[in-house]
């Protein structure tokens, strides 16, 4: 399946696109010539990873008959200092509500399935940098 994204320059450091009917604006911070009209581009990689694996995990848990009332996915990463600046590692923190009647082995299995089989974003990022994870029950 072919994919394509087009970004239109808005002047300065700002670019705009439309994806699935949603307008997205990216921009740089004022320190580097932007106006802060939108997020910077690199954090979208973290969002893509969190969203991709989060959707996998919740879908798998639903199919396993698990009832989830609260779920959060956070991705922590380190940016290199030298150019080209990039994320050198990714650490995914899956957070669940501790009071939910969740089978923790099924949670672990859902995460492993996402990371090893379904999450294409994770698969791409693993080719360049380590991707690790942990599960927290809050």
Task: Identify the function of each model-found stretch.
Residues 1-47, 58-138:
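Extended beta-strand/beta-hairpin segments
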């Amino acid at each position: 399946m072919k994919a394509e994204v087009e970004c239109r320059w808005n002047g300065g450091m700002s670019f705009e696109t439309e994806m699935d009917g949603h307008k997205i604006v990216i921009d740089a911070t004022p320190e580097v010539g932007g106006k802060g009209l939108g997020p910077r581009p690199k954090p979208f990689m973290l969002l893509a990873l969190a969203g991709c694996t989060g959707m996998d995990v919740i879908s798998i848990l639903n199919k396993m008959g698990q009832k989830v009332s609260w779920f959060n996915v956070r991705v922590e990463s380190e940016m290199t200092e030298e150019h080209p600046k990039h994320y050198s590692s990714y650490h995914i923190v899956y957070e669940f509500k501790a009071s939910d009647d969740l089978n923790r082995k099924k949670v672990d299995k859902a995460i492993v399935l996402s990371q090893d089989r379904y999450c294409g974003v994770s698969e791409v990022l693993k080719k360049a940098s380590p991707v690790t994870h942990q599960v927290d029950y809050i």
